[in-house]
């Protein structure tokens, strides 16, 4: 590769990393807006924890666990902060930063589902565990060259499905993992005080600022233009410039379709279009398209967005009203359900090897198997982590602290005075 092309690719990767980093304040504002004002400082602090601890731990060990060895292994070799093992064309420091912001995204998804009742000290522990072990290990199976993406003729995936698992930017690897962990964490915590009456009926606990939540979603939408197109990791040459342009388009179309689908469904279902659910509908479309944004057509992206936007509404209702799991921001539905759904639909709608384009069911099977394995890993880790913390030290704050707000009791300060 010539120097100019490699330099352009490096600059694009770093710009994309900056956009993905910008998703952190997007998540922070979205979560803060969907929760009550007495917990805002706690929400913001947890989002800082995700990136601060994630940056250090992923540099020290997580990067090695994810990329430290090639082949069909379970986990890469630890690097202990030594980056010399990496042999790619792009500068290793830049690639590390790009992967770090993805790792932090997976960790921060969990925060919203466990909002308003989690001990801050325990949040630090499980945020660190996600960045150090949970995300890097399943990341090694996929983006790290592990067994789910091993395309050797005699590999398990090729001999079983005739194709490998594909997740271009992380519908499963990042989002469904975060969503499954969020669901397990919310189950371990239990619902907020006053969320369900004595008959088990769900009672709405409105957030304090749809303005903040709306701004957060707009910022996330912007950040996704680094999250998905940036995963091409190149911008030089005709192939790459066409690829990132295509991914930009499919990403935007899915987001718009998800929001439109949710808006009209809530209008029909509840008599009025819901802003809060429409915001989550946009995110549902973004999460859903992330796996196959490089493989599906623009119309395929619209279909994925529409389906995710519709399914989102029923998923939130089912988790809240039927399962009685209290997820204040809908993270388990947006990232978990729609991450899984988007990955599966990639197996159907991929132009190059999807079942609906006459290429057989092998790739669809690979997508279903891959997301199943990844999320079973996340669920198993979540059960051990959250229920282990709950038994050993306690995961939840006292009732009085929850009722009066975590800001003062956990941090000694409030966002609003």
Identify what each model region corresponds to:
Residues 1-417:
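Glycine- and aromatic-enriched membrane alpha-helices
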